[in-house]
Amino acid sequence: NTQTTYPVLYMYDGQNVFHSREAYSGHSWKVIPHLKWNSQIPDMMIVAIDHDGEQRLNEYTPWEMNPAEIEKTQQVGGLGKAHASWIVECVKPFIDQHYRTSPQKETSFLAGSSLGGLMTAYTGATYPDVFGVLGIFSLASWVNDEAFLHYIAQHPLATQTKVYLQVGTMEGNETDQGFTSKNVNQMYLDSSLWY
């Protein structure tokens, strides 16, 4: 049907969305098979937003990482605000203009895991009239909990916004451990609970 319009799911860490051979983590979310196997999920478009490899920590953190959490001396993070703005002001309008989307808030979804989850939470709070559904997996707000919690308190979500929040009990990896000596699994759990 050439008149049909579709909801759109925008996903952070686009390299991980479709194929494992492209995934920076070595395995993908395999979104297409999951959509095919679950007939309850409506047809939709998926926009997989890649990060810039080595710049992921900078792109996916709205604030500099908390020095108390970093055992390194370099400045890390702080470009997430510009990245969120780029998605809302450039990517989404381009997709809505060139494809048959349902551009309304209720049919515009945003999801991500770890730092992608942080960016999903941040973007949802910053632009409450743009995305109506947020999928936040393994929220990594621990990179600067103080700034995150203060920001979220000052920028509440719209009451109609739907949030799916998920965290496991085996979170984190060697990359996370490179930034802190704390229990990374507990840090992810706390981030999700405090949100």
Which stretches of residues belong to each language-model region?
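Non-catalytic cap/lid and distal C-terminal segments of serine-dependent acyl enzymes
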Residues: 1-195
